[in-house]
Amino acid sequence: MYKRQELEIKYILDLKDFPGDPNEKLFIKDFNIILNDPEVKVVVETMGGLHPAYEFVSACLKAGKSVVTSNKELVAAKGCELLGYAAEHNVNFLFEASVGGGIPIIRPISQCLAANEINEFAGILNGTTNFILTRMINDGMAFEDALKLAQDNGYAERDPSADILGFDACRKVCILASLCFGKHVYPDQVHTEGITEITLEDVEYAKDWGGVIKLLGRARKSEDGKHIYAIVSPAFVDHHSQLASVDDVFNAILVRGDAIGDVVFYGRGAGKLPTASAVVGDVIDCARHENKQKFFGWADSEEGYVSDYLDMPTALYVRARAQQKQQVISSAEKTFGEIKLLKRAGAPEDEFAFVTPVASERELRTKLETLLGAEIISTIRVTDY
């Protein structure tokens, strides 16, 4: 028979004082009160950062308390270890809110898609950068102006580095790749680029190609299935892709399984209520699985598990300038084979742009170095999502 279980907040740990707050009596400043209280079965960590979150969470798990977190930095760096502590002590470590805010993604991958072998995923994982790129694409705003608008609207921090340099998306890629492929992926294993070098000229060339520029976090299995590639970078996305129509602060994650094909998870990737929705959902899941651990986790990875991103197959968009433009274009056609030339209104006479065929990025960049007389202005990866 189903038995309803009541949940009650017993403590709120914070170093600040909150006089007059409706929950004023719940606030404490000593973590050990929580750790040593046998009535506390589930602990929620939302402080962010690696320390002291790691010390607090590991202590709780070792004390037989389940933990729910929204802390992507913690899970990306220490997820395998903390899941191990949870298994050892028959409790749960859940982190649905660490990727995609309120978008259900961790549980669907681990449960609903469990019958699939996941081959790859690609996602718009950061709302700040997606808002900036949307304004550049739809309104013709320069990067600096779009960033300021994002800050004015509360979508970007005063120091936006973690977002615009790709670090936030990198942590989410680590979590998703670990979950999808079964071995831990660490942040320093993921090649990471941001959007600070994207210009309106690139946006216009992407439009002529037939798509838009998005900051994508991606991972895929190698052909032999023994390794993976993982990368965060701007990418050309075809207009027909579901990812191309994801605008402003929304996130979307495309997952490719051998049985299901392509599945896309879409929604608000940040914000108080979406994040709270995911956190509370995990708390309820812990309550439903009291005294029994969910089969959930991954193994640690060996050296070389994440392959060099330069060996990953891709096409490249190339923007360049050359005094002898036609001669260099002819050389590019001989070097790369069939290339797609792009155009934009108002381009200088010496500027040109093209998209290469698919090859390993290492091979493509080696060939670019042989284009004598060409000054390469920018390159962006081209995807098939």
Regions found by a protein language model. Give the residues of each.
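N-terminal glycine-/serine-/threonine-rich beta1-alpha1-beta2 phosphate-ribose binding loop
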Residues: K3-A63
